[in-house]
Amino acid sequence: MSYKVIVPATVLPPWLRVGENWIFARHRRTEVGVVLPANTKFRVRADFSRAGFTRPVIVRLLNNNRSTEREINLNNDQWMEVEHAHESVPFVDWLVGEKNTMAEVYFEIDGPHIPLPVYVFNTRPVEHFKSEYRQSSSGYCFLYLDLVCMLVPPASKNALLDVNIFELHQFYNEIINYYDDLCGLVEDPYADTVDSNLPNKAAFVKADAGGPGGAYYGPFWTAPASSNLGDYLRISPTNWMVIHELGHAYDFVFTVNTILIEIWNNSLCDRIQYKWMNKIKRQQLARVYENRRPQKEATIQALIDNNSPFDNWGFFERLIIFTWLYNPQRGLDTLRNINHSYRVHATRNSSIPYPQIWSWLTTSAYDNFWLYFNLVGVYPADFYVNEHNKVVHFNLHLRALALGQSVRYPIKYIITDFDLVSKNYDIKQYLESNFDLVIPEELRQTDLLADVRVVCVIDDPSQIVGEPFSVYDGNERVFESTVATDGNMYLVGVGPGVYTLRAPRGKNKRYKLHLAHSPREPVHPANDHMYLLVTYPYYNQTLTYTPYVNSDLAVDMAHLFGSNDRRYVATIYFNPFEQTVTVHLNNIRAGRENNTTLYFEMVISNPFNGQSQTFTILEDNPTLRQGYYKFDVVTYSSIRLNMSVAGRLLFRRYIFAGGTTTLTMFPNQVLEPNLFPDGSALNRTLARLREQAAFLDNYSQLMYIENELRDTIYLASQLVDPASDEFVKYYPDYFRDPHTYVYLFRFRGLGDFVLLDLQIVPLLNLATVRIANIQNGPHSYFDTLYFKVELRDTNGAIVFSYSRRGNEPMTPEHHKFEVYSGYTVELFMREPGNRLQLIVNKMLDTALPSTQNIFARITDTQLVVGDTSIEDNLVTSINVDCGDDDNQKIRVVETLKMIAF
């Protein structure tokens, strides 16, 4: 008997490659519609006359044991004769990666064969199908349940007949749809965007008595290692086997050398159990708790207290860290964002290494989880390789500061007597663990308040006394004051939580700041990033100021990558000023799992006493802990670096070959063999200086917040060229203010009410506009244009424009936008004089021309102002009746005294 099978193509989205197994990409196949008894002979061929497909057509003879199955590759249109010794069900794989094509496969079956019962969901009554299957001599049947296709083996026939197929359909489809949603995949029949899902995808389920383990997810199907489907027919929120194996379809690259194999997919499993279960079931039945939450929390507590390397934690201990990461509001957006980032990366350039996983999660989150990660012993790397194959600084903490991220931390470390059952303070939001992560805003409801003293330890209190400080929860300022005359900060009525402290950083001296609990008090998450933990009961803090003299941008560093995928492993800082070498280890696996071969070794030798210090990284390092390893180094010490793999150690801009290289620590720089100190160190510092200035340009909010990077840039610029003003805009306020001009144009209307404020700060490339709420208009006596503001870029295009007739109502607005050198400002005021004022650095400029038209051009640091059009691309008119002009001279507005704004 003859059969023809038309095989469609599986169109891949741009982020998915042929040969990759994610999201069931190679699971689709079409049944021939028969069951072949053992030793049945048949002929098969593929029709290659249809142009387009370029790969062999694959026919599979499937049953319930891989050892008795067969794969047949059809490479041409010639008939192939086949005889198979075992009962089987023939299928033809879809053509993966092809577009606008399909294959036709012909079968000629000589011997007896049995029709395969097939059910396509919702196309006929289920009972009709079950009746057909029950009466059929076939032990096999095949189900199309939308997002899952299932080859049911003889051993599961009775079980399937007892199953509610509608519930089975809902079970599988809800799992896969939810996993798709967690990863941010979007249905798209054209599959041509970075977030496109796989069109017409479906998981293929079968039995495999010869399979590994208890069950597995493979490139072509997922299966229990059994002759029957077992749990694959069990509909239950506790069916961990099924939700676990389906989760493997979404591992992507997140399990490669990350110690997250069998963790990443299970974090999705935990999320669907979180969705399915109520509060009681979540505690009793969820796999992460299993009615033993207090005991599991105690295990985590012991691991933290003992500083156990996270990579050595148990399977479910590592998993539960993701439970608490994803529990908060917007926690799941972290998962969606990191998946989107992966797809962007895979679409652009799959050869560029992915970021270290903890950095990747940190930069994908809406909240700041860095302190939480440090608590459990993982350290996000602060560097990554961008799409141009260049090592780039993340600046994780400054990025979080610029984005106004709130800091999440386990509630048990904030309210130290909190207990989910016995003392939960009647908190309204759902919490399921004493380790759930909270922010200060969520703890206001507790009405717990503290008065906290921050003791400032500084060599020169005059640098900070009387200076303002503030405490922030994300973008919200919750407290502000000034440093008291005793040199301390006093926080009054602050609730529990982790805040960001914006502390004064000195005046004409620069400091590095370190924040921690006072001595002998419970351990504070000590840090240099101003994360302030206010506990209940509360404890005082110590803020230590250490003089900052030599910029970190003058410190050379090396970047160590993994052997196979170039994952980020460590940063090595060579600091000749402090005479230290510091290794920041971010990944304890540099190569093959469980391999103890030497990967990297650093030997520091003291030339004066002959002593040496050694730091070693093996391919796998289960006894090492992520974090910082610091070594003291004297001048003229030799630093021998030994690499087992070429091209995996980057020092400055040089990629080391395999073998040994020896560096020498000189007074102001570290040099390779046969090189001597020269001016190249300044050139490297200048290059880093410009990179970090560009970072501040991208995160311009940091230009208005005192922070360590601005200190670092100031110190580096003084080292490179003290006379240059190239980086003045990035300086700390104390050094920048004398160069800063703030221009405020104030428009007034009838009754001298303020209509509009236009403020321009050329040095910061900033313009802001505040528009008042004047319902009757600026001046009801005028029915013509009363005032106008217009800014244009260097090409004459309008950047901002606003105008009103005298009787035209005004509603409140606030605008903030960037302006640059060469931009022009055109102002019109129907009644000039006192109705239009210019205030420079809070001082009224009395020399502003008293004309209806005012023109100005923005320069790097100032405004050039006049009452006539200014040459060099300035637009000459606002196109209104402006009255007479007196041809006033153009002048530069200057100020004799700087007043901070």
Curated annotation (Swiss-Prot):
This is Viral-enhancing factor. Involved in disruption of the peritrophic membrane and fusion of nucleocapsids with midgut cells. InterPro entries: Mucin-bd, Peptidase_M60_dom. Keywords: Glycoprotein, Late protein. Residues 27-330 form the Peptidase M60 domain. PROSITE patterns: PEPTIDASE_M60 (PS51723). Gene3D superfamilies: Peptidase M60, enhancin-like domain 2 (3.40.390.80). Glycans are attached at N65, N265, N339, N349, N540, N594, N595, N642, N683, N698.
